Amino acid sequence: MEIRIVDHPLAASRLTIMRDKRTNNAGFRAALADLGAMLVYEASRDLAIEQFPVSTPVADTQGTRLQDPPIIVPIIRAGLGMVDPALSMIPDAQVGFIGMARDEATHQPVPYLEALPDDLSGRTVFCVDPMLATGGSLLHAIKLLADRGATDITAICMVSAQEGVDALAESGLPCRLVTATIDPELNDDAYIVPGLGDAGDRLYGPRNIDL
């Protein structure tokens, strides 16, 4: 599996803001938006392009645009925070949704929503979720995408745990990973260490509805 770690001073500074427990919801959202745009920029590096004629105020020339913009698929809830940054970089992208919550007792994903095109054959898919911990949620999402015909899937995560990266690599699913960092371990509650806490709670506040 191809893994790209975005090693850049601006990415590192935004990640530090997100890690800091003193950062409030608004500050966390702002840092996530900046870092999300950087990761989408890197994930888009190899997208196919096409040229077309364009006229500047001075002369005619050739412009460039994406040949086939990807579909952005956030894993709800925390993945929603990465949609606007992705669309700021690729405004003509479509958006699908996969909803999953974590069972706090088993640490396993509990799916509750799928809103995706029936056929993803030939489509490039960016699956976005701030955290890759055990890999359970992301593996479930990527399998859903692959079952609908997707063979070009990029997982975009802010922070990835080595355990989740290994699970993704060993799955055999058609996926590459773009991330800002790979953290070494998970704690007994399956939170990434050092990580940044619960990304959904830090984006939107505590979830008070059991799914």
UniProtKB/Swiss-Prot annotation:
Query: Which branch of life, at top level?
Result: Bacteria
What biological function has been recorded for the protein in this entry?
Catalyzes the conversion of uracil and 5-phospho-alpha-D-ribose 1-diphosphate (PRPP) to UMP and diphosphate.
Q: How is the cofactor bound?
A: Binds 1 Mg(2+) ion per subunit. The magnesium is bound as Mg-PRPP.
Which gene holds the coding sequence for this protein?
A: upp
Activity regulation as described: Allosterically activated by GTP.
Tell me what this protein is called.
Answer: Uracil phosphoribosyltransferase
Provide the E.C. number(s) assigned to this enzyme.
2.4.2.9
* InterPro entries named among the record's database cross-references: PRibTrfase_dom, PRTase-like, Upp_B, UPRTase/APRTase, Ura_phspho_trans
Annotated positions binding uracil: I192, G197, D198, A199
Q: Does the keyword GTP-binding apply?
A: yes
Entry similarity comment: Belongs to the UPRTase family.
Q: What biological-process GO terms show up in the record? A: UMP salvage; uracil salvage
Q: Where do transmembrane segments lie in this chain? A: none
Q: Name one GO molecular function term.
A: magnesium ion binding
Root EC class:
transferase
Q: In which pathway does it act?
A: Pyrimidine metabolism; UMP biosynthesis via salvage pathway; UMP from uracil: step 1/1
Pfam families to which the protein is assigned, alphabetical: UPRTase
**What cofactors does this protein use?**
Mg(2+)
Assigned keywords, A-Z: Allosteric enzyme, Glycosyltransferase, GTP-binding, Magnesium, Nucleotide-binding, Transferase
